[in-house]
Each structure stands twice: as C-alpha cells, then as structure tokens.
C-alpha cells in the first residue's frame, strides 16, 4: 500500500513539474511603472545593505563635490514609528515587567511559607534532567530570591 501511494505521489509530482501554465490574457498590458519597478528590483545597487534615500536629489547632493550645501547622510529623514507609539510600548513593557516581578515575589513568598527550598524545588521540577527552559529560569530566580531573602533576614 505504501509503495502504491509513493508511486502515485511521484507520478503527480512529475506531471505537475512538467506542465506549463498559460495565461488567459494574451495582451498583458505592462505599464512603464511596472517595468520601472521590476528594473529597480533587479538593479545591482538595490540590495538590503545599501542606504536608501527618500529624496532623489539628496543622493545627487551627496555625490557632487561642487555643491557645498550637500545633505549629510545622517540628516536623511527616515520613516520611523512616532515617539508617542514608542513611549506607549515602553510603558506597556515596563508595566508588564513590574506586574511579572510582583507576581514572582508573591509566588516566592508563598513557596517560602510552605517550606519550599531550592533543593526541593529542583527535585519537583526535575532540574538537571528533562526540565523545560522556563522551569530552569524559575528555579534560578527562586534560588536567587531565596538566598537574598535568607541572607537579609539573618543580618
């Protein structure tokens, strides 16, 4: 049965790879804008590492030695995300980080009240064997918190 399915699959792949698709439109009506976009994509200078200029005259200004008022590359404007959106994201990240820290603190306090030590936590989470990465990170955070808590409580 496997051989039959394999033969059918290979036949299908061979058939599909040997056929050619034909367009339903005989006259594609390619515009000059399409041709320009295509040549821009195929251009040697159009790569991901090259500096892109928003204004074509700024590229000419940078290359001409006769013009003393040339635009510096670093002064070229870029379309970045507005600062209000960036500030909102940073506030959300800070808020989430604070919330997560508070939840870890509460959980660690409850674990400490129940007598959980880093050794018992390591046994429970199988640290050093088949533990997931998040369990190992939780173990490391709890160990650091436990040492800090017991060191500060003793002094």
Curated annotation (Swiss-Prot):
Q: What induces it?
A: Expressed early in the interaction with Arabidopsis plants.
**Any Pfam family:** RXLR
RABA-binding domain as annotated region, ranges: 105-155
The reply on keyword Membrane is yes
Query: Per UniProt, which keywords does this protein have?
Result: Host cell membrane, Host membrane, Membrane, Secreted, Signal, Virulence
Give residue numbers for sequence motif RxLR-dEER: 52-78
Q: What broad class describes the main subcellular location of this protein?
A: secreted
According to the lineage, what is the superkingdom?
Eukaryota
Q: Which residues form the signal peptide?
A: 1-21
Give an example GO cellular component term for this record: host cell endomembrane system
Can you quote the domain comment? The RxLR-dEER motif acts to carry the protein into the host cell cytoplasm through binding to cell surface phosphatidylinositol-3-phosphate.
**What does the record note on quaternary structure?**
Interacts with Arabidopsis thaliana RABA GTPases including RABA1a, RABA1b, RABA1c, RABA1d, RABA1f, RABA2a, RABA2c, RABA2d, RABA4a, RABA4b and RABA4c.
User: Its function?
Assistant: Effector protein that contributes to pathogen virulence. Targets members of the RABA GTPases subfamily to inhibit vesicular secretion, leading to an accumulation of secretory proteins in the endoplasmic reticulum.
The identity of this protein, by name, is RxLR effector protein 24
Q: What is the organism of origin for this protein?
A: Phytophthora brassicae
Name the gene. RxLR24
